[in-house]
From Swiss-Prot:
Keywords: Ribonucleoprotein, Ribosomal protein, RNA-binding, rRNA-binding. InterPro entries: Ribosomal_bL20, RIBOSOMAL_L20_CS, Ribosomal_protein_bL20_C. The gene is rplT. GO terms for cellular component: ribonucleoprotein complex; ribosome. GO terms for molecular function: rRNA binding; structural constituent of ribosome. PANTHER family: 39S RIBOSOMAL PROTEIN L20 (PTHR10986). It comes from Chlorobium phaeovibrioides (strain DSM 265 / 1930). Belongs to the bacterial ribosomal protein bL20 family. One of its GO terms (biological process) is translation. This is Large ribosomal subunit protein bL20.
Length: 115
């Protein structure tokens, strides 16, 4: 009786890992033991940076809103405080978009909130 092995599943497993390493340079793309480490590390970075991306974009939106608010004679913190007191619920992403794409509308918005 021939020896049983797990060739089909093993080949599929190796192929799946190697596919994730497509485009990697040198042995990181074709030597299985090195590829496993490279793919593991890449997935760790991806997991971490999906969370960091949210923080980075929030900081960017705040910077843009603050810059536009200062052009209108106020600051980000005063603007947000006034928004909270008047119960204006516009998220930072939308406000930053308005500040960049339509400065006149942002000026109108700031005047409505501050006054």
């Amino acid at each position: 009786m021939p020896k049983a092995n797990n060739a089909v599943a093993a080949k599929a497993r190796r192929k799946r890992v190697l596919k994730k390493a497509k485009g990697y340079w040198g042995s990181r793309g074709n030597v299985l033991t090195v590829v496993k480490h490279a793919v593991d590390k890449a997935e760790q970075y991806a997991y971490r940076d999906r969370r960091a991306k949210k923080r980075t974009f929030r900081a960017l939106w705040i910077m843009r809103i603050n810059a536009a608010a200062r052009l209108n004679g106020t600051t980000y913190s005063r603007l947000v405080d006034a928004m909270n007191k008047k119960s204006v619920e516009i998220d930072r992403k939308a406000m930053a978009e308005i500040a960049v794409k339509d400065p006149e509308a942002f000026t109108t918005l700031v005047k409505a909130i501050i006054d």
